[in-house]
Structures are given as C-alpha cells and as structure tokens.
From Swiss-Prot:
It comes from the Bacteria. Together with its co-chaperonin GroES, plays an essential role in assisting protein folding. The GroEL-GroES system forms a nano-cage that allows encapsulation of the non-native substrate proteins and provides a physical environment optimized to promote and accelerate protein folding. Belongs to the chaperonin (HSP60) family. This is Chaperonin GroEL. It is found in: Cytoplasm. Keywords: ATP-binding, Chaperone, Cytoplasm, Isomerase, Nucleotide-binding. The keyword rRNA processing does not apply. Forms a cylinder of 14 subunits composed of two heptameric rings stacked back-to-back. Interacts with the co-chaperonin GroES. One of its GO terms (cellular component) is cytoplasm. The keyword DNA-binding does not apply.
Length: 30
C-alpha cells in the first residue's frame, strides 16, 4: 500500500517538477 501511495504521489510531484522545469527553461531561453 505504501509503495502504491508513493507511486501516485511521486508521479504527481514529478509531473509538477517537469512542468516547472519546462517553464524555467522557456523563460531562460526567452
């Protein structure tokens, strides 16, 4: 159960991190 929960949370947080990183790169490159 813990691993499943961690997987769900990890997926969401990773997606958020990727979005944030993409936005940062976009801003940096202008």
């Amino acid at each position: 159960a813990k691993s499943i929960l961690l997987g769900e949370e990890g997926r969401h947080s990773m997606q958020a991190g990727v979005d944030k990183l993409a936005n940062t790169v976009k801003v940096t490159l202008g």
